[in-house]
Design a protein with these regions (language model features):
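Gly/Ser-rich catalytic serine loop of serine hydrolases
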Residues: 153
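Central hydrophobic cores of alpha-helical transmembrane segments in multi-pass inner-membrane proteins
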Residues: 56-60
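Residue-level recognition of oxygen-bearing side chains
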Residues: 77, 156, 177
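Juxtamembrane transmembrane-helix boundary motif
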Residues: 1-21, 25, 29-45, 61-145, ...
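Transmembrane helix-bundle signature of multi-pass membrane transporters/permeases
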Residues: 48-55, 85, 173-181, 239
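Alpha-helical transmembrane segments of helical membrane proteins, especially in multi-pass transport
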Residues: 186-190
Length: 251
């Protein structure tokens, strides 16, 4: 393994560790790292599809740890994925290029991080799961955006769950993890059904190794060790880092 590939794998490991700690797959970070490496010359479809594959691995590991620790609430998760799956699949079949999407996503991430910061770190009372007429369109919109941009949607869903007090940080992480997994799979399926799949499994193998280790470390810390307020702070960091990486990609 040459030094360049080793550096990429280490960076992917770090991203997977941080994102898995809050139940995310890490696609935003993976896209940024790959774009800043020699793989940046690849088409957007190649980058998105490989990021989705890494998402599948890390989100699965994260969900398992948060589920095992008793943080998953099915009645919170199901309404959000009902519409997100078909819309992510449809969006994944679209061929989307242009920097406008990077800019819009960066704005969304910064706003989400700012809102999380301004509400403070106190937990407050959980209001309970949202009504289906609210959760279904919310999940659908995030699913569509995920398929267009190349993410799993965790960085968009988690802030909403916390700001609306529909979930604790750890239950939000569990829901975000399964949400990311189904959206990533749906988006890849959409690309496959539209004959746009360009996966290189020999390229993915070392990446898988790196993110599996990071995913285990991060999700174990987030599910079993970190206090709730630490999870909130980690999520703010994740959102800011993802936004900064997107902005860098515009230049």
């Amino acid at each position: 393994m040459d030094l360049g590939l080793l550096a990429i794998c280490f960076a992917l490991f770090v991203v997977a560790t941080l994102y898995a700690s809050v139940g995310h797959g890490g696609a935003s970070g993976y896209l940024a790292i790959l774009s800043l490496s020699a793989y940046g010359a690849m088409e957007a479809a190649w980058l998105k599809q490989h990021a989705w594959c890494l998402n599948l691995v890390v989100a699965a590991i994260a969900f398992w740890h948060f589920y095992r620790a008793g943080h998953h609430v099915p009645k919170l998760t199901i309404p959000f994925i009902v519409a997100s799956v078909p819309l992510a699949m449809f969006a994944g079949s679209l061929k989307v290029e242009g920097s406008v999407y990077d800019l819009l996503l960066s704005i969304c991430l910064v706003l989400a991080a700012w809102r999380l910061y301004t509400v403070g770190t106190e937990e407050g009372d959980i209001r309970g799961v949202p009504q289906w007429n609210v959760a279904v369109p919310t999940g659908g919109a995030i699913g569509f955006a995920s398929g267009v941009v190349g993410i799993g949607g965790g960085v968009l869903l988690s802030p909403i769950l916390l700001l609306k007090r529909w979930a604790t940080p750890k239950s939000a992480a569990a829901t975000a993890a399964i949400f990311v997994w189904v959206n990533s799979l749906a988006s890849l399926s959409g690309a496959a059904l539209s004959n746009q799949l360009v996966l290189e499994f020999e390229t993915l193998l070392p990446f898988f190794f790196a993110v599996i280790i990071g995913g285990f470390i991060g999700s174990r810390f987030g599910a079993d060790v970190a206090p709730q307020h630490i999870i909130r702070k980690l999520l703010i960091i994740v959102l800011i880092v993802a936004a900064m990486k997107r902005v860098v990609g515009l230049f």
